[in-house]
C-alpha cells in the first residue's frame, strides 16, 4: 500500500479539475490510497470572489505537517510568471521543519500545471522541482508515455515534465480530453512508482 496525496491550488477551477483527474488515475492502481487536498487561499475572501475565484472547491485544506504522512505527493499549481502560484509557495515555505528532519526525503514528487496561453508551463514545473529537490524527493516526470503527447491536431497542454492545460487568456478554455488523459496517466505513473518504492 502506498499513500498518495494530490495537493493543489486552483483559482478558477482548471487545476481542481486536473487534480481530480490525476487522483482518478492514481486510484486505478491497486494498492494506492489516494487523497486530494488543497492549499489555503491567501487572498482576502472579497478580493478572491471579485477576481472570479471558484469558492466551491470540495477538497479539504491541507496542513504542511501532514505531507510527511504520504509516500508520494503530486502537486498542482497554475503558473504565475513561470513560477508556482503564491498560495502554493506560501504553503511550501512552511515546510522548513519537515526539511530539517528529512521527513520528505525519498518520497515521490511530481507536478502538473495550467497556463493562460501555454507560456511558462514547463518553466513552472521545473522551477517547482527545485523545492522538491531540496527536500530530497524523488522527482517523477512523464516522458512521452502515452500517445496523446504526439497529437498536435488541436491546442494541447502536456509536457514530458508533467501534465498541463491551457486555459486561454480569459480562462474560458477547460481541460481537453487529451489533457485529462495525460493527467490521468500522471496519477497512474506516480502511484505505480510509489508502490514500487514504498509499497
UniProtKB/Swiss-Prot annotation:
UniProt keyword terms in alphabetical order: Flavoprotein, FMN, NAD, NADP, Nucleotide-binding, Oxidoreductase
Cofactor: FMN
Pfam families, per database record: FMN_red
Chain sites annotated for binding FMN: 10-15, 79-81, 114-119, 134
GO CC terms: membrane
GO MF: flavin adenine dinucleotide binding; FMN binding; NAD binding; NADH:ubiquinone reductase (non-electrogenic) activity; NADP binding; NADPH dehydrogenase (quinone) activity
Binding site for substrate: 99
Reactions this protein catalyses: a quinone + NADH + H(+) = a quinol + NAD(+); a quinone + NADPH + H(+) = a quinol + NADP(+)
Entry note: cofactor: Binds 1 FMN per monomer.
EC number(s) recorded for this UniProt protein: 1.6.5.2
Domain named Flavodoxin-like: residues: 4-190
Top-rank EC class of the record's enzyme: oxidoreductase
Amino-acid positions noted as binding NAD(+) in the UniProt annotation, renumbered to this chain: 12
Family to which this protein belongs: Belongs to the WrbA family.
Name of the protein this chain belongs to: NAD(P)H dehydrogenase (quinone)
Organism of provenance: Marinobacter nauticus (strain ATCC 700491 / DSM 11845 / VT8)
